[in-house]
Amino acid sequence: MNVTEFRSGLRRWLDGNDLSPGPDHSLDGQVAQLARVRRALYEADWMRYGWPAEVGGLGGPAVLRAVLGEEVATRGLAEPGIYSMIEVLAPTMISYARPELAAEMVPLLLGGREQWCQGFSEPGSGSDLASLTTRAVPRDGDWVVTGQKVWTSLAQYAARCVLLTRTAPGHDGITAFFVDMDAPGITVRPLRTMHGVDEFAEVFFDDVVVPADRMLGRPGDGWRLAMDLLPHERSTCFWHRVAHLYTRLDRLLTELAEPDDPGEDLALGAAYLALHTVRCRSHGTQRRLAAGARLGPETSVDKVLLAGAEQQLFDTARDLLPGVLELTDTPWREEYLYSRAATIYGGTAEIQRNIIARRLLDLGRD
């Protein structure tokens, strides 16, 4: 099935199957809606395209997943921030888990039966991921994990966690596990953010026993896994977010009176151009994936462009809708506040620019 056939068939199916969100816009409601949408799309096979048959997929290029995400976002069927983890964690499981484990678990994620989380950042190890201290030690054929993670998205809803631990010194001493979040010794404490949604959490591991067959890859493969995962976190998982931001630009145009100030036209044009640039860059990433390329440091360009475009769009809304953010409780206010983190989550803008300078432009470390 080519992209045109897929998109037209998907649109016909969505037109005939109402998956619109209900009245509950709380985080609980958003997570339940995401599960509902994924389950319906999986049962109708749309969620299975672009994934390998070994994990219940129907094959085809990864761009089909991007098309699906765009349609979900354009119709407002699922909150974009929580939809994104599929494109981060499923490829990681396919690449690093035992084939039997991936075949068992990935359909649970794609089919909306489970939510997963990613346990990377720690209180003292955010951008400096290699300094993480959560420790895993072997004991009686299993591994015992002790430590703390923070900024773990949706941990309070997650059934599983892709977890980085330290098993030896240095980069080669980082090992990844696929951990059941209901295991004894795990405590989850949600964190309230300034936009009023407790989607992040800190997670404590107190002598948590993890079976040896839940290791992802081999001992010491955790750093390589992270380097393979993070490019997805900085590119493919944002395909649908670009479409979501276009809907917000459309809403801004609808709410504005007919512009009579050339400066307004310039601001709107600049916001559109920033989004168009991200979309063009994203299409290039999709083509590289379709050609079998492995994503790498070039995805930092995707992340920088997207973060800049998102903040520019909501800055434009603030400037052209005076008082809407400051004096009223509207979606504009919540999304503006959320956009402030766009240059932080998934690796700060400064880190991304350092990666671009050192690994793409070969400018050295100074």
Question: Regions from the language model: what does each represent?
Answer:
Residues 186-277, 342:
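Glycine-rich beta->alpha junctions and the first turn(s) of the following alpha-helix
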Residues 63, 67-68, 227, 321-366:
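Glycine-rich phosphate/cofactor-binding loops in nucleotide/flavin-utilizing enzymes
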Residues 22-28, 276-330:
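C-terminal helix-coil-helix/basic helical segment that borders enzyme active sites and/or dimer interfaces
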Residues 43-107, 111-112, 154-160, 275, ...:
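Internal helix-loop-helix
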Residues 134-137:
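A structural signal for short hydrophobic beta-strand segments in well-ordered beta-sheet cores
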Residues 142, 146-188:
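A short core secondary-structure module
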Residues 112-120:
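A short, Trp-centered hydrophobic/proline-enriched beta-strand micro-motif
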Residues 1-82, 104, 108, 269, ...:
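Amphipathic, small/basic residue-rich leader segments at the start of a protein or domain
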